[in-house]
Amino acid sequence: MRLTFVILLVFLTILNVLPHLSQDLSPYDTGLYHQHIVEIIKQEGLIIGSANLHDRIGFNNSNFYLVAVLEKLIPFVPGHYLLNPIVYFGTIAYLISLIFYLPHYKIAYKIIALGVIISISLHPLFIVSISPDTIAYCLSIVFIFKILLKSPGKSLHFEFLLFAILITVKFSSIFLALMFVPFFLGRNRRIYFKKLSEYIFICLFVIAPWILSNYLISGFVVYPVLQLDFLSPEWKLPLSLAQSHMETIKSWALSQGLGNAKYTNVWQYFFNWYETYSVNNIHGSFYLISLYKLMLPFLFIYVLSFLLNANRYQKLFEFVFILFLINSLWFFSAPDPRFSYATLLIFPFTIFSYSITKLFNKKSVALSKTIILLLILFSMARICFIDFGFIDKMKAPKIQTEGNWVPTKYGFMTFEPKADQCWDVSIFCNPYKNRNLKLIDGDWKKIIEL
């Protein structure tokens, strides 16, 4: 029976993954700096001050190290067909296993899992790519479900490990720290506080090496977070550049360069965002906006039910409120859906699941079987979208980057691309054509700006 389930699990997961492999959804940033970073890691491991070539190298997303390792181990398969599809496969498999294995009294979580599977199957972000966004939202989905399903008093070691990894992949995942709050304020808080030192150690064990590499690459603890600026090595990026980058990230997330990024109050901020994402389908925005419009009446019912019977729904309400808070922090910091795709999807389905379980309260077994049937039918329908043309795409030649080798004032030969995308043409690609760079060659290569 167990073997049969494993075969079914793998089969359904494959049906949900295969349709995406023929779609190269690599974002523009892959050519801009993603592939450049991977090439640096493969050839040198790390170049001190390499962010002086391109400041976005300073983001130092840890997934690029994994991509580099996989490309070394499996050189005949392009990197964008390796890490992200594997992580996406694992996430879908995990959600499917929840639908099959969770007991009937946890039917609400099965509904949420089904909603998320359908959502990320129909509206994926960068599956065939090396973008950190994919692994960030996939691992965030797993993290949130592990938190929601955690039994009172049980250890949080794995969840803190996953959280620490997420921080190194995408620093915007820092908001997920709020998911731990109910554990440290609830009835079992003494149990969790006793193990707090262990949780902190796990986080430091993962994050400390990443912070060190951040420092060596850009001179910042976390680039471009200005609040963590207290180091000044000779290779450090200018503070003004970091400040400008933060402003660019927020304004671009608000308008995508298509709408108005200027605002004077909260309402104008909201309307600027809505004007951008309701007219342009950016990172699944059409789907998300429709989902939230549909959710509004259910949200009203949910809040009203909680007020009438707070004790019964306290645990679920705590996490619903935290998801709402995380989404609010996302909205007022950098409101591009790709920065918090997991919480943006899980929040409305949590509200929907409550309403559905209230309606079918006495038929949870039948509802559970219905959810499994819907999962199987949806997965089978995905067969129509499978295109094995991705096999030929995997054999396609590398993108040729046009440009010239030009020396800087200090004799440092860098490659200046005709456009601004470096891809993997050279580890010394210089898209900003900065002629003030100097290379100090030694056991560790170092790039400084004079």
Predicted features, each with a name:
Residues 12-13, 88-98, 102, 106-147, ...:
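Membrane-embedded helix bundles of polyisoprenyl
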Residues 87-103, 268-313:
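Hydrophobic, aromatic-rich transmembrane alpha-helices
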Residues 124, 156-182, 202-205, 219, ...:
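Membrane-interface alpha helices of multi-pass inner-membrane proteins
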